[in-house]
Amino acid sequence: MAHSKTRTNDGKITYPPGVKEISDKISKEEMVRRLKMVVKTFMDMDQDSEEEKELYLNLALHLASDFFLKHPDKDVRLLVACCLADIFRIYAPEAPYTSPDKLKDIFMFITRQLKGLEDTKSPQFNRYFYLLENIAWVKSYNICFELEDSNEIFTQLYRTLFSVINNGHNQKVHMHMVDLMSSIICEGDTVSQELLDTVLVNLVPAHKNLNKQAYDLAKALLKRTAQAIEPYITNFFNQVLMLGKTSISDLSEHVFDLILELYNIDSHLLLSVLPQLEFKLKSNDNEERLQVVKLLAKMFGAKDSELASQNKPLWQCYLGRFNDIHVPIRLECVKFASHCLMNHPDLAKDLTEYLKVRSHDPEEAIRHDVIVSIVTAAKKDILLVNDHLLNFVRERTLDKRWRVRKEAMMGLAQIYKKYALQSAAGKDAAKQICWVKDKLLHIYYQNSIDDRLLVERIFAQYMVPHNLETTERMKCLYYLYATLDLNAVKALNEMWKCQNLLRHQVKDLLDLIKQPKTDASVKAIFSKVMVITRNLPDPGKAQDFMKKFTQVLEDDEKIRKQLEALVSPTCSCKQAEGCVREITKKLGNPKQPTNPFLEMIKFLLERIAPVHIDTESISALIKQVNKSIDGTADDEDEGVPTDQAIRAGLELLKVLSFTHPISFHSAETFESLLACLKMDDEKVAEAALQIFKNTGSKIEEDFPHIRSALLPVLHHKSKKGPPRQAKYAIHCIHAIFSSKETQFAQIFEPLHKSLDPSNLEHLITPLVTIGHIALLAPDQFAAPLKSLVATFIVKDLLMNDRLPGKKTTKLWVPDEEVSPETMVKIQAIKMMVRWLLGMKNNHSKSGTSTLRLLTTILHSDGDLTEQGKISKPDMSRLRLAAGSAIVKLAQEPCYHEIITLEQYQLCALAINDECYQVRQVFAQKLHKGLSRLRLPLEYMAICALCAKDPVKERRAHARQCLVKNITVRREYLKQHAAVSEKLLSLLPEYVVPYTIHLLAHDPDYVKVQDIEQLKDVKECLWFVLEILMAKNENNSHAFIRKMVENIKQTKDAQGPDDTKMNEKLYTVCDVAMNIIMSKSTTYSLESPKDPVLPARFFTQPDKNFSNTKNYLPPEMKSFFTPGKPKTANVLGAVNKPLSSAGKQSQTKSSRMETVSNASSSSNPSSPGRIKGRLDSTEMDHSENEDYTMSSPLPGKKSDKREDSDLVRSELEKPRSRKKASVTDPEEKLGMDDLSKLVQEQKPKGSQRGRKRGHAASESEEQQWPEEKRHKEELLGNEDEQNSPPKKGKRGRPPKPLGGTSKEEPVVKTSKKGNKKKPAPPVVDEDEEEERQMGNTEQKSKSKQQRTSKRAQQRAESPETSAVESTQSTPQKGRGRPSKTPSPSQPKKNIRVGRSKQVATKENDSSEEMDVLQASSPVSDDTTQEGAEEEDISAGNVRRRSSKRERR
């Protein structure tokens, strides 16, 4: 090919063949055509063509002229750029351009052309790609390293490439760009900050989100150049982080984002930077620390991050930020936890301790987020969270903030549904969270209506989902009920009871609305609205919304009809859902973003809609029970023994028979129940009888074949069945049959005739049956009953001791060891009481003579004939029966009036009986009558005597009873403002005169001026006054003061002329007055009204006599210390997130929550005494844990305690204010051993006094169960209660050796049993009566077994336990006059103190507990199950004490 004849050496330009001169004189199109040919020529050339290189040198120089570099046409520029790229390739390594400025212009020109890469759809894109490929391949830009302006060129190139890259580019474009840029970094001497910024800016989140491809390009570039670029990155961070030179780069503010991105790209890029972060974590700048924490949270929490294992110091330093003083930092740490738990299960152990502290953070948001983090991880996989973490969620269900409680409850519910109901992770996972169902239901004990509504919602949606098909739903409920613990069962029963009650209230409201409008009906509607309002959240708003809803119901018949259908007893579950849907749909129009009115009505509808139980459901449930009976159910697969499942199923049906009786009305159901009646299991038959009693009202009319089959069974049960079945058989006949008189006659006559006092074994059932017939049909058998009582019951049974009792010094034995004669006598007493309660009058003086008989039994210690034939345990049983009988009769007004003051005072002393079980059961009977407002107010004064009980748990229980009863009365008065005529019998403050009178007549109060006896009086008064004075409502302090002043102006009505008696009365008044003055600042104000004193107890005040004398000895003054009484019922204390009852005080840093710092002066006592054994807040759960008796105030107390993972041990000295020393369990055991040694050195008591002075010492009461068992084994052959107790004052623990007392380790018990038991909502009153005494044996039997190892099996029957431990330590023959009066012994005066710290802590913990329990939702019918568990452990504690005293 011939060339144009232009020589190269004369500066003329040689063009490739066929290409004419390219100048500004030709058109653009022609120029483009010619340039394309030039491009082709250069493209085909290679570096070896020396001749051609020489030939086209001038052309190469010409193409670099400004004419081309600044040409306006982009196509021209592109072609020129491609030529220049090839020229650099061909002439490499020496470019034909020598001028630095020209080189800069050329590379800036090429860079500009690279922008054309942006449009991938351009026809020229391939040429742009060629340009990129060429310069990347040749590394043309490396020429610029020598240029002064190289940084500007590179920076421009980088910016251009990062700006043009987009998702239209393929992998090759991406790769060439990386090649081009990486060569500049890897082969250059330095990387300027500006160039580094152009790379790093693409990692900043804002840029990253705008151009993901640029981010990927930067990422690839950094990975490729990691080694080369690392020093420059380190320098950059060093400048910004350590030296604070933020001006060196615009990216300084994004430094933490960059670190994260760089770490994710390649951790080696930050090898030298990470240690700087440790320094930054300790910065004084809150915001800076927060930034670093946010950064590290992402770095540590990232899925494949190994940072925690690679950089342990940084990890530890980061964990320290969980305790940062700045709230947002702690919040950030907590939020990070869920990612960490999910992505790095191996770090869970490290996080647990820190999350524990944060779960007690004073900031609500942080406690909330701890829950969220743990629950989020658990929902992903239950194996990611350990038991400790789940326990933190459990604890927070008792948080003081609703938001936190709600999150914890919902979290647990979701976890339960996923792993227990749906078995998402197998049986092991289900086992791990089996406690959740119990825990969630325990929350129903909370006072807060929000908590209870949420439990109801959780139950309906997560525990037994209402949308399950009926059979599946009932199976779910059946096995749930069979596996719940006792507390949860009672809570669930209570839930159904509350819902049923509310359903009836709404039904009543609808009935009232349908009546014609009158003033009376409007008042009745308002009253009903107020009752319903109390069952909804936010009563203030609820009241307004309920009024509005009432108006809607009056105006809108459709809604009213739907609501009527919903509350109808025949409403099915499906129908209920339809009704709720329709009502909410109508109320929801017009639609609003938020409609609080609709939300409130939804709450109401949720509570009353029967979404679980209808006739079909009951039928399905019965079938499920039948399957278990037939052995075709999968009980074992569900982890429930068949017997337990059947029993639980019948119990469940029994409860539902109270709340949904109509749903049982089907032949199939009744036939199945008939089959259950014939089963051998007594409990099953008993439950079936109760179900018939509750649901059988229509059997006679609708199911005649059931009636005829049932009647002979009932006759047989009432004559020859077990006593409890006999009782229910009689009640069934009464409920079902219209011909009940005939039936009763057919049963009564043969039983009456066959009564044989010599055949004791067969007397109990007839006595029970006759007693209940007498109760239900008193007039039908009036004459035969009267003669039966007079001749057979009193003369033949009670006044006769046929068989000598076993010789033993035990005070209590199990039922099977009680002599048959005593069991018959107990039933005889009960039969008399039922007869009197049926008669309800004293016309024939039968009540008077019965009361005389009962008090004689009490007076004679249970040995009515005083022949000495009856054994001590039998005497205890008879004392209990007599005391309980008087309490029962006192609940009937006609008998209350005839109980004399002496009889009342003697009955009161049963609460200080020497036998623990007598005290315990009597207290429960007393509480039951009081809490139902059936017992007169003077019986509440008896609780004051509990201050003398040596066992802390008994004092604690008595205090709970008082709190509950005072609360019940105050609530009643608030809700029934019109009952002012009953004020004297209801106002709790009126218990003060009765208490003063009772204490003045206390047989222990002998010497009027005796300091020790007066201190006892003060204890008892403070026991009552502390709770009454906790709040000064309506100036009640002044009212109480006025009452006490008025008493001093009267005389004792029991002995108005007895000077000594009146002096005692005035002295007790002065003790009360000193307490009031020392504890109140408002006592001197004017009393709101003049108190009226009970005329039976006090004479009319003498107007002419002013009794201003002070009857107290001067030295008593020092025992009244000023200070405010601790609050008995403060709602704010309900859910302290950081203090669990019984915990030791924590440091501020560990708790970060303030607790009340009540000093020991809050009890009116000597300085050496702290807080009294039972101060207002001293509910030392350490001892109380095992005592899960049917507390009047069940619920949260033990929950809080259960959650506490700290144990307390104190060594205290009298009059000491030292901080309690907190020891670990090993140390505590050591202290146990120490106390044992001390005891062994004590001389044994040689006298047996009638009265027991020594209380169970605290250290023995609080021993670890295993330690106790060990001691029992060592001393197994020694009967702890046989040892004669030393003489001393009633129930007051004497001064221990050396004047010090050790409170030793908290008794650890299973979490399962340590809640207070609520009574079932639907319990037959008499049934409870019968169970109480008959089952103390069961209660006692398990005492010895109650070790922590076996505590989990609490729900199982304790029949197999050893008998030895059932004995009760004689406290002392409290109150019954001694047959051989012993001279009063001086009492050691030092009160054992407890440390100020612990006292303070106890304040908090039990303040919480009191409130939790003060208005527990659960009814106070203290049933056997409730009482059982407290007694079980009571024995353990009491047994220890007698050992100690004997030594």
From Swiss-Prot:
Disulfide bonds: none annotated. It comes from Rattus norvegicus (Rat). The keyword Cell division applies. Its main location: nucleus. This is Sister chromatid cohesion protein PDS5 homolog B. The gene is Pds5b. Regulator of sister chromatid cohesion in mitosis which may stabilize cohesin complex association with chromatin. May couple sister chromatid cohesion during mitosis to DNA replication. Cohesion ensures that chromosome partitioning is accurate in both meiotic and mitotic cells and plays an important role in DNA repair. Plays a role in androgen-induced proliferative arrest in prostate cells. It holds the Pfam family PDS5. One of its GO terms (molecular function) is DNA binding. Keywords: Acetylation, Cell cycle, Cell division, Mitosis, Nucleus, Phosphoprotein, Repeat. GO terms for cellular component: chromatin; nucleus. HEAT repeats lie at residues 383-419. Residues 1156-1167, 1378-1387 have a biased composition (Low complexity). GO terms for biological process: cell division; DNA repair; lens development in camera-type eye; mitotic sister chromatid cohesion; negative regulation of cell population proliferation; regulation of cell population proliferation. InterPro entries: ARM-like (IPR011989), ARM-type_fold (IPR016024), Pds5 (IPR039776).
